[in-house]
Amino acid sequence: MQLIDPARSCLHCGAPFGAMVCTECAGARTDLDRCLAAAVFDGPVGRIVRAYKDGGERRLAAEIARIMLGAAVRAQREAPGRYGGLLVRADSVVFVPATASAFRRRGFDHMELIARHLSGSSDIPLLDALVKHGSSDQRELGRADRLAEALGAYEVVLPVRGKRILLIDDVITTGATMSAAASALKVAGASHVDGLAFARVWG
């Protein structure tokens, strides 16, 4: 597993190998204040994600949450100028919800389970604040199509006004999903939204 150096990653989408905003994010609008990914989406990480989401290995939720939480703790410690307060100033953990079709296929919301473990280990309250509209699978879509698909896809159903939100997802591919969810939270009044993911697709 290739962990991402928090001092050398894109602050907008978590992309590794550079202490500046990446090419994809330069000039692009996002409502994420900061974003961190724990690891590069490579062979071992991909196998973990597939085993958890589609292989029925729900026990992996606790381990994924542990790795994500460890990355956030490390980022606060090693890159305080970039990620200071990522955990300690967060008011609530909010997860990016699964689509209706994914929920039916798997029988559970994979991010809700991870969020419960992460919330329990960090003592940051869990807020099940987002609902996903639409049911299309984005795995085969490019950046532009993902952005178009994600616009208006999320509805905030619990109060978030004035809150600092730690928004979590399993894998960032283009950042469109995280950005759209963050946008919904900001429109609903969240004061600050940081993103945290298990992995970032790269290359």
Sequence positions of predicted segments:
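Glycine-rich phosphate/pyrophosphate-handling loop used in enzymes and phosphotransfer proteins
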Residues: M1-G203
